[in-house]
């Protein structure tokens, strides 16, 4: 893929609001997108996420009153994803220890040099000293995951749209009631739908480069 094709792909990627309900993403293509999400980068490589693929039609109907910004995705898109974010991802948490031992295959305890680097990064550099700040920082990682999946989808000719229009507390309570979320461990970060648009692509409206880009010599 050359530079011109890369830019053309950005223009082709479109936050579609209308989807063809009769067109479905193939199993192989969807497996590829999930793999892209799995391989996405995250701060310190902690992967503080989980994806829920919502296929249950009854649950889609139930979510509509509490997810106004997701109606088009719940009604017509081929695949609808709820991105969960892990809570309490501190340097000394059981989860971080588990990641280091089982995924990174490295020795790790809260007194090790690497643990202290993470501690300093979280507490002093990023000021992650509250439950909310930790949640927001971890949520940023899920947006990277979602963005990577959306761009990979565009490469496969699949449309997508990120979704933030929902009542977080109500959605979390509903998912917990259904047994798909433990709010002591996870929260809802963002949603996205994937499928094939049933509308024309409108030209992108963006600031000119000189407004949003500056070089420091």
Mark where each language-model region is:
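Acidic, surface-exposed loops and disordered segments
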Residues: 1-217
């Amino acid at each position: 893929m050359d530079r011109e094709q890369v830019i053309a792909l950005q223009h082709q990627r479109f936050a579609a609001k209308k989807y063809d309900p009769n067109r479905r993403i193939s199993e192989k293509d969807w497996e590829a997108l999930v793999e892209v999400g799995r391989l996405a980068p995250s701060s310190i490589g902690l992967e503080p996420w989980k994806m829920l693929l919502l296929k249950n039609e009854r649950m889609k109907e139930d979510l509509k009153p509490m997810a106004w910004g997701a109606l088009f995705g719940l009604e017509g898109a081929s695949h609808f994803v709820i991105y969960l974010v892990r809570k309490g991802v501190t340097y000394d948490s059981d989860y971080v220890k588990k990641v280091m031992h089982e995924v990174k295959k490295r020795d790790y305890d809260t007194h090790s040099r690497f643990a202290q680097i993470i501690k300093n990064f979280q507490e002093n550099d990023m000021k992650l000293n509250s439950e909310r700040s930790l949640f927001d920082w971890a949520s940023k990682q899920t947006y990277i995951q979602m963005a990577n999946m959306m761009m990979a989808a565009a490469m496969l000719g699949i449309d997508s749209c990120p979704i933030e229009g929902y009542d977080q507390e109500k959605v979390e309570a509903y998912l917990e009631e259904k047994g798909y979320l433990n709010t002591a461990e996870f929260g809802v970060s963002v949603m996205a739908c994937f499928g094939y648009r049933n509308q024309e692509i409108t030209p992108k409206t963006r600031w000119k480069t000189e407004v949003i880009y500056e070089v420091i010599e």
